């Protein structure tokens, strides 16, 4: 049973070697590739370094090429100047100085605008109006119903308005009665003539009851026309 296993192991190793050989053959490298890589490496090496060289006096912090004795002399002078300008202060003096500094803080600094006030800025309250909270759906529905009721117009309302407009437009006889009489003296004769014509029409209607209804209707129309003309004359006066 062990012999076939050894054979399989050998066959696996042989197949892997063959695969490696095939991959190497397939991986073809162009002839000029190695030369390009070598040229790039040589160029990188040939470029000058940008690091600061400590040997050069231009970059070692001693451009003036001073001696250490001169440096110590300058350091002593600077120390003396600083000692003369600095003094020791106790705690009590520090408190007094801080209070005085707070009083004079308004004069210090600068103002961004002419209208800006000195001192610390107070709390700025926002002037933006807040939005109203959304009401519930029930309240919205009730408000909409009220608006619809106010805007709605029923047929009864329309009929009422139409009747109110028709009432003042009464018959011409009523209009003539409401108007005040003017210049009665001059028109007495005309009134008498009109009344006589109306009376004659009425008499003919009573005297001849046996005639046709058409004649009676015509006479009624004539009577109405005479009344209308009489009212128009009074209105023009």
UniProtKB/Swiss-Prot annotation:
Chief place of localization: nucleus
Question: Which keywords describe this protein according to UniProt?
Answer: Developmental protein, Nucleus, Wnt signaling pathway
Q: Where is the composition biased (Polar residues)?
A: 162-177
The Basic and acidic residues compositionally biased stretches are 52-62, 203-216, 225-237
> At which positions is motif Nucleolar localization signal (NLS1)?
182-190
Please outline how this chain is modified post-translation.
Answer: Phosphorylated by ck1/csnk1a1.
Q: Where in the cell is it found?
A: Nucleus envelope
Free-text disruption phenotype from the record: Morpholino knockdown results in embryos with small eyes, head and brain structures.
- Per the record, which residues fall in region Disordered? 1-23, 50-69, 97-237
Per the Swiss-Prot or TrEMBL annotation, the motif Nucleolar localization signal (NLS2) is positioned at 217-225
What Pfam families does this protein's entry cite? CUSTOS
Which residue intervals are annotated with compositional bias (Basic residues) in the record? 181-190
Which cellular component, as a GO term, is one annotated location? nuclear envelope
Q: Name one GO biological process term.
A: negative regulation of Wnt signaling pathway
What PANTHER family would the database entry show?
A: CHROMOSOME 12 ORF 43 HOMOLOG, PROTEIN CUSTOS
Q: How does it assemble?
A: Interacts (via NLS1 and NLS2) with dvl2; the interaction is negatively regulated by Wnt stimulation. Interacts with csnk1a1. Interacts with ctnnb1; the interaction is positively regulated by Wnt stimulation.
Family listed: Belongs to the CUSTOS family.
Further notes on this entry? Named Custos for the Latin term for 'guard' or 'keeper'.
> What is this protein for, i.e. what is its function?
Essential for Spemann-Mangold organizer formation and subsequent anterior head development in the embryo. Inhibits canonical Wnt signaling pathway by antagonizing nuclear import of beta-catenin (ctnnb1) during embryogenesis.
The name of this protein is: Protein CUSTOS
Native source species: Xenopus laevis (African clawed frog)
